[in-house]
Amino acid sequence: MRVVTASLRGELLAVDEPTTVETEYGERKLAELQLRPTDGTDTDGDVTVDVTLWAKWADTAAHAEAGMDLVVTDPEVDEYQGEVTYSTTKESYVVLEPDFLVDVTAIRSWVQCPRMYYLNKLSAIPLNYPVVKGTIVHDVFGDLLRGRDLDAAIEDRVAEAGLELGLLGRDVAEVEGEVRGNAAAIEGWLAQGTLTDEDAWRSEYTLISPTFGLKGRADALRRGMPVELKTGKNTSREPRFQDKIQAAAYALMLDERGVDVDTGTLLYTKNTTLERTEESGDLSPAKEFTMGKGLLEFVVRSRNELAAMEARQEVPTGYEADAKCEYCFEQDTCMVVSGRLDQESKAGAVGRPIPDEEREYFERFYQAIEAERRAVHDEYRKLWEQGDQERADDDRALIGLEPLGQREIEGNRWELRARKPDDAVSKLREGDVALASEGDPVEGHAELCRITELGEEVVVTTDEPVSLQRLDVYPSELSVDRMLTALHDTVLKSNDDRKDVLFGRREPAFDDGRETFIDNNEGQNRAVNLAVNAQDCALIHGPPGTGKTYTIARLIRALVDCGDRVLLTAFTNRAVDNALEALRDQGFEDICRVGTDTGIREDMLDVQLETRGDPHERAAELRNSPVVAATTASCGSRVMREQSFDVAVVDEASQLTEPSALAALNLADRFVLVGDHEQLPPVVQAAD
């Protein structure tokens, strides 16, 4: 494998259909394209060039359209009568829409079935035991790579997952035993003689590829080779094909950095728990495979299909792949979604379509959310398009940091410290997830980190140490993903009565009760009465200075007195904590605050939900709290999505997009929106 050293890039102006021609080597497939180069050539913006894609790269032309961007690496350049033409070579890769950074796990899903990729976007990873145990095993894997004692690592990581395990009703000893069984494969493999003192390990390694349009976090790198951990079993000699795809995608990104990757390893940890008398085949957990050029090309072509579909804003049907629906564990879900949204699907469809207005609502917001995703990808692109000073001037990075040291801290993580220049400012905030690097966040060594202090000194925590010389805003698709899930849950899972109100088919209903909750302000008292008597929803509007926060606190107390469990939420941590402060000022303390140490105000940390510890105690604290407070973003987490409330009270509602608000409203039977539409509107990144 060779390093990518040259490329042609530009906007497609015309795309011909693939065809077959006779050459001196026999029949070959090709496709002709017309491109306006944007870099990689000496031509200016008015010049167009012809590009020939040979062999399997011609298949990419079937997915390309005028207006898309294209990259051809290592092209052959010919000139005839003043005309410059380009064509692919044996070393070439062809990349469609390289600015759309496809996550490696998305390609894995796409290769299994494009329809599965789509379904995974709509429905978030649920809170279930295999997912939680898998996370624990992965964390133990990282600990063992750093030389930590196995028993200590297992005990610590199981305790770390205490809340989730408690919500699932799991016993600590049982979980530790199962994790130990999986970890035996890791420990045994690390003890093999194939590993030497010269082996350099990195775990959870962040990779970004501007050339291939890829991003992801490799489970581990050993001497630059990707190692992927799977908590399931595989008794075949070869790794599963979709697992090879995942490792090969990391190899491509490493190749772009000049790392010569020719081998990948898949570690199936459940194999060590199998009994030879019960299972046949190859029970060895570690399965290595060779990274051939054909496999790497297949990864890029698959990625191109996905990126092209997203560029066309289409929904996959499943016919794009050879997957057999009858063997798919998502078949039933696929058929239900297809039936309800009236979509074409290889698996077929069941059920009646939802009303046209609901389907139109879903499609409109689906496209709006995906536009937001593309805006996030534009921010990724700035990581390599903008220079150091340009990013600093744009407040997107802190540069010129002076490293002050690093130390290992609790949880087998690292604390990094650096001094920042006196005049340095940025959009970074304490609690943010950012990208810490030695100076080049894309081609150099970089680690995802969480900012814990941001004053004269910068303090961050990471999984692995790095010399902290630069800190960049790291774009995240988490909010986009959670908005999609909220949209899916509202349209496809909400009961018809709730949707009748949301879509205006029925007026909200109210009881006739009347009490005095606030005796010195009739407007506030009327607002509390309205909300308490709401059978469906209520809107409370109040300009600045009208006492909305005080009213919210009194409303929550009244709802709890009625026996309701209440979700208090808002777009920002600041708004949530301000409402909590007002509630506590009124003497109410039976509160559970969901969030991180860096996100929650210091004087509210005493009511923070502790996620670490005894599973039953952690789960009981959350379940038994009559008032749970969290941001709307946190409402989309897998823990919060398992909770149910009688009423959701949403402060500063005007700052929320509809899908962001739905993440909270989906958790409650009734809701109250509080805010002022004349104040701050929702924050969005997409221009549309």
Question: What are the residue ranges of the model-derived segments?
Answer:
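Pre-ATPase regulatory/linker segments immediately N-terminal to the P-loop/RecA-like helicase/translocase core
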Residues: 272-289, 293, 298-306, 430-520, ...
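Conserved helicase motor core of SF1/SF2 NTP-dependent helicases
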Residues: 562-564, 570-574, 586, 618-619, ...
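ASCE P-loop NTPase motor cores of helicases and related translocases
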Residues: 465-628
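Mg2+/Mn2+-dependent nuclease catalytic core
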Residues: 29, 38-66, 200-304, 425-426
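Accessory interdomain/linker segments of ATP-dependent helicases and helicase-like nucleic-acid enzymes
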Residues: 1-27, 331-441
